[in-house]
């Protein structure tokens, strides 16, 4: 019988670790020859080490994917590191299958890790039973009735931004170059502060002091914006053992999380105290002792409702986790989409004029949600913006078991055989190509890459099976994990466009080809000739009417 001495243990442990590493590396190196995806059509790898990674990291929009999809069909194989095959499909039946089986297809651990750096452990990151509980409790706060109540905030803050730009443009003779993204980001931050927590960021106030919560989120966004261009962060996200190695990113994000935690706990304590005071004083109506329409108050109310069993309620930590989720999802995505909307309108002055004519027919400056939703061309412009410029361009899922994914469009393998399913192994990642589906010529026609709001007057039959929660688009995903706040975002965006396009004319300030985009959590605009200035969207803003 063999026995180990104290001297042998380190050697045995090292040998075991080496054998385990050799096994894992061997499996990875064999995947190009053993993966069930190897028979799928797709582009050749540019190199054995990088596969198609370098090509994809260098692309600014969906042009390269579109080229490949036209050549290889809606379901294809891409090559990751070491030529490992990766599934890529815009097949509507396949996406519907994966999105509707969210338990079997959760987010990969590395994606959840990256999102936690920005969003915390909130609804977007939660999986399984916790996600279902959070969703059930939070759903009422994002219903139509609640968004109707919040529309007043959307309009008031839109008008505040309008007045700031109006004064700025007036000082400069009625026309000025303005970085619209900066103002829109401040406006949507103010909105989510009030609508989300009844918290004043005062981001639009030019005399306001720097806000530490806003500064904390800028640090978190820095992490994600660097994720696509830093090989160290990519490798670190894939190998959890490397995350224990401290670096500048991890130190800054840890400090930022401390700030959000402290302020979040303070907000929750204030809401609970106010609700308790209301209950003790017997107040029944909202807005007497507390502006109870904000999302956090509604969440706390719902969580303490007698209709929710004790074992189904969220802990304070679970409620706290929603604070960064509300902030990021509630302001960065909407400001980004509105930025790209005005960019599109600056290129299509005919569309801008037609839209302004419709908006000018509304007899009030403070429209309700129902009045905004009753404007058909505004609705078409918003839909077309969300199609071409979705704030989040892709998602990802991972198979928790071996499976066969059904296809609407069969593919031919390398041996000439047709298949109407794709067989995948446990651990296979499944990208959700939001932008790819939204811009597919096979679904939307040859003009799929053009900004044409009129297309919404007669939507192609081919887009009907797209499994999105809203408007035959993948922008807000679909299934049990569809974006809970899509109504909030759409009405806020309509309020912004309504207010700004009635007051201003927008034109390009730089050549169209000088505008590029970089993808982090959202796709942010940059000016190629002014990259040192960071993200921006400069437009020429002109006064249209005297207010």
Swiss-Prot record:
It is an enzyme of class 1 (oxidoreductase). The chain crosses the membrane at residues 9-25. It comes from the Eukaryota. The keyword Signal does not apply. Disulfide bonds: none annotated. GO terms for cellular component: membrane. Its EC number is 1.-.-.-. Glycans are attached at residues 336, 438. Its cofactor is heme. Its main location: membrane. It is found in: Membrane. Keywords: Glycoprotein, Heme, Iron, Membrane, Metal-binding, Monooxygenase, Oxidoreductase, Transmembrane, Transmembrane helix. Belongs to the cytochrome P450 family. Cytochrome P450 monooxygenase that is able to use 7-ethoxycoumarin and testosterone as substrates for oxidation. This is Cytochrome P450 monooxygenase 128. It comes from Postia placenta (strain ATCC 44394 / Madison 698-R). The gene is CYP128.
